[in-house]
């Protein structure tokens, strides 16, 4: 993604990295931080902050808590997704409950998407 990011939200991203949700911690420490392709946490992309971002695979992972299911949350997520997709990024949304109920399946799904993306980009 070549577009400049909003420097005003960098402090917010840093704060979010220090105060991850339990689902973000679980996915990060038990899977993404040791994944063979590099992921970043709370990455500023344009005017938004992505929960997890893999530049090499052009993949954004968003973990969705209850706030994402309100009408306002859904509208915000739609705008954000459209903005990020303009830059060729793939956005996947994972409900927080899925992290608890099917962690292995979530990891396998992410792995599949990364491999698929990398094979298309090569």
Where are these regions (language model features)?
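Nucleic-acid endo/exonuclease domains
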Residues: 1-122
């Amino acid at each position: 993604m070549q577009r400049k990011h909003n420097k005003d939200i960098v402090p917010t991203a840093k704060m979010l990295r220090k105060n991850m949700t339990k689902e973000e911690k679980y996915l990060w420490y038990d899977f993404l931080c040791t994944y063979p392709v590099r992921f970043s946490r709370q990455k500023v992309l344009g005017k938004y902050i992505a929960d997890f971002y893999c530049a090499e695979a052009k993949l954004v992972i968003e973990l969705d808590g209850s706030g994402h299911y309100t009408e306002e949350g859904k509208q915000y997520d739609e705008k954000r997704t459209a903005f990020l997709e303009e830059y060729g990024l793939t956005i996947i949304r994972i409900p927080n409950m899925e992290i608890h109920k099917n962690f292995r399946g979530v990891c396998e799904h992410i792995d599949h998407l990364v491999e698929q993306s990398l094979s298309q980009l090569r």
